[in-house]
Swiss-Prot record:
The active site is at residue 193. ATP binds at residues 76-84, 99. Belongs to the protein kinase superfamily. AGC Ser/Thr protein kinase family. cAMP subfamily. Activated by cAMP. Keywords: Acetylation, ATP-binding, cAMP, Kinase, Nucleotide-binding, Phosphoprotein, Serine/threonine-protein kinase, Transferase. It catalyses: L-seryl-[protein] + ATP = O-phospho-L-seryl-[protein] + ADP + H(+); L-threonyl-[protein] + ATP = O-phospho-L-threonyl-[protein] + ADP + H(+). The gene is TPK2. GO terms for cellular component: cAMP-dependent protein kinase complex; chromatin; cytosol; nucleus; P-body. CDD domains: STKc_PKA_like. This is cAMP-dependent protein kinase type 2. It comes from Saccharomyces cerevisiae (strain ATCC 204508 / S288c). PANTHER family: CAMP-DEPENDENT PROTEIN KINASE CATALYTIC SUBUNIT 1, CYCLIC NUCLEOTIDE-DEPENDENT PROTEIN KINASE. Its EC number is 2.7.11.11. InterPro entries: AGC-kinase_C, Kinase-like_dom_sf, Prot_kinase_dom, Protein_kinase_ATP_BS, Ser/Thr_kinase_AS.
């Protein structure tokens, strides 16, 4: 669904400014230094105090809400169908993000199925690197999705500010994305819209994949043309039946973009981009490590019999690739790995400094009465 927060400019340090070009030897290995361990334990204790004010599964029950349960603080992003707001619960004081979609626009743009799929997918998933939805509700004009508020902003913003990431940094984010996609695919969910704009960073610098507007539960194959042009696999463009392998193509494009600062098939119009994708010619900058060139050549390939992730061993082939040889996957999943970048969150819980300011407008929320679109959104 083309509903993402506008591209914010991050405030404060970038990847280069934090000197994490040296974030290399053992970057994805667990920590061993005792003093560093003790410092991190103190930081974790402090973080536990902070996160006691954040949504926790054991403290906050998922369910049905109404607009009266929240105080709208400010707009975090705008899109074709509505807005994303930072809100605060009037019951527990915790902060959430509420995604609001205008029913009329969703129906007009023929996005009803995608919108219902998004609700269904978010209700199903629970993973450290995926956004969490707490509940939904609706009024006569809008539908509302209550989700975690992730303060660190978009990976897109950090990438544009940094221009491109050093090899180990791109590897870190790619590895967390792989674990998230692996989980989705194990539940027969294709994500179909992987891009930096849909990857948020939490306050510690770990990823959260958001915006499930194109996600779909698929047992075998599907045919729908959807996604963002630069990241779409060739089989989607040619309207051939496709499966989870399209996400691994997009992963390859994402890794390329993180390392180069631009996508491999970029052009001035979607049609020209599609032409380049179908031609399949990828030019690798000379500073790309040979291992990542080998990996990308096996991800960004139209030949599904060669695209790793789509072969008999599935995602294990990607995780076993030499480019990921340093990764301790179990530690990464447990978030027991140092992150290359911690967002400069200065105002504590509810900080919005990493999101752009938007003019606030009169909101038509909470209106009751006749609902001509009720039949389309019965599950909300």
């Amino acid at each position: 669904m083309e509903f993402v927060a506008e591209r914010a400019q991050p405030v404060g340090q970038t990847i280069q400014q934090q000197n994490v070009n040296t974030y290399g030897q053992g970057v994805l290995q667990p920590h061993h230094d005792l003093q560093q361990r003790q410092q991190q334990q103190q930081q974790r204790q402090h973080q536990q105090l902070l996160t006691s004010q954040l949504p926790q599964k054991s403290l906050v029950s998922k369910g049905k809400y109404t607009l009266h349960d929240f105080q709208i603080m400010r707009t975090l992003g705008t899109g074709s169908f509505g807005r994303v707001h930072l809100v605060r619960s009037v019951h527990n004081g915790r902060y959430y993000a509420i995604k609001v979609l205008k029913k009329q626009q969703v129906v007009k743009m023929k996005q009803v199925e995608h919108t219902n799929d998004e609700r269904r997918m978010l209700k199903l998933v629970e993973h450290p690197f995926l956004i969490r939805m707490w509940g939904t509700f609706q009024d006569a004009r809008n539908i509302f999705m209550v989700m975690d508020y992730i303060e660190g902003g978009e990976l897109f913003s950090l990438l544009r500010k940094s221009q491109r990431f050093p090899n180990p940094v791109a590897k870190f984010y790619a590895a967390e994305v792989i674990l998230a996609l692996e989980y989705l695919h194990a539940h027969n969910i294709i994500y179909r819209d992987l891009k930096p704009e849909n990857i948020l960073l939490d306050r510690n610098g770990h990823i959260k994949i958001t915006d499930f507007g194109f996600a779909k539960e698929v047992q075998t194959v599907t045919w729908t043309l959807c996604g963002t042009p630069d990241y779409i696999a060739p089989e989607v463009i040619t309207t051939k039946p496709y499966n989870k392998s399209v996400d691994w193509w997009s992963l390859g494009v994402l890794i390329y973009e993180m390392l180069a600062g631009y996508t491999p098939f970029y052009d001035t119009t979607p049609m020209k981009t599609y032409e380049k994708i179908l031609q399949g010619k990828v030019v690798y900058p000379p500073y790309f490590h040979p291992d990542v060139v080998d990996l990308l050549s096996k991800l960004i390939t139209a030949d599904l019999t060669r695209r790793i992730g789509n072969l008999q061993s599935g995602s294990r082939d990607i995780k076993a690739h030499p480019w990921f040889s340093e990764v301790v996957w179990e530690r990464l999943l447990a978030k027991d790995i140092e992150t290359p970048y911690e967002p400069p969150i200065t105002s504590g819980i509810g900080d919005t400094s990493l999101f752009d300011q938007y003019p606030e407008e009169q909101l038509d929320y909470g209106i009751q009465g006749d609902d001509p679109y009720a039949e389309y959104f019965q599950d909300f």
